Amino acid sequence: NASMLGSAMRIDANQQSKLKDNEVRNGYVVFDADKLQQYYDEQIKPNLKLEREDKKVVVNNAGEVLSTETEGHDGIVIADGADTEVGARLAQVLATGTGSVNVDGKVDPKQEVKVTHRVAIDLSDRKLYAYENDTVVKTLNVVVAEGNDNVTGECVGMMCTPTGDFNVWQKLPSQDMSGTLNLADGTVETWDVKDVGFVNYFSSGCAIHRIAGGYVADAVMPSIANGSHGCVGIGWDVAEWFYNWCNMGTSVHIQV
């Protein structure tokens, strides 16, 4: 940098004159090591590094790795004490007209950062909470089984959404759902529903999926009575987000 070099040097016609402690000479040209060091500290040093990016993995409650969000990379920083005399060394190189100035670096190893994805579903308030560690990142309205009371969430019928702790064991972007249930009162319940979207199975035949029967937005879900055979229905406008966020193996807790 020509302007930097100009500000760090002066012309002295008397080659025998006494120099300051921070100065060196090349003929009539005197170089100021302190000014060279200042330029390095302010203009060059801030760019002599590569910021570390940690590897980010998604895990479930058991600590099992479900996916890798970012691979990350090591960082590079200046080695301790490697640049304390850059100004003096550079001044010497300029004074002699030979050599170079090298600054040693060291690796700042990337770390692995674990983020726990988990789902909590409360049947009493009919909400699904998507957690990343201990932070709720999204709250969705849900419609659950017809046997669950719409206010208390208690199982008061023959077809209820199961409670307890589960893991997502199968995911399908779309599925035709059909089945038959022989109920305790002797009746037989059958269904055949086409194109159920964004399906996340967590317990046997029970899944979290886009609510069937046509478009329903998340905001409208609270006005719909419970009516599934055990599945958890979510709004059409949030189903794809949840499907992409919820990995295979994600922990699911369902409570009343």
Regions found by a protein language model. Name each.
Residues N1-M177, N182-D192, C246, H253-V256:
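Surface-exposed, secretory/extracytoplasmic low-complexity segments enriched in Ser/Thr/Asn/Gly/Pro
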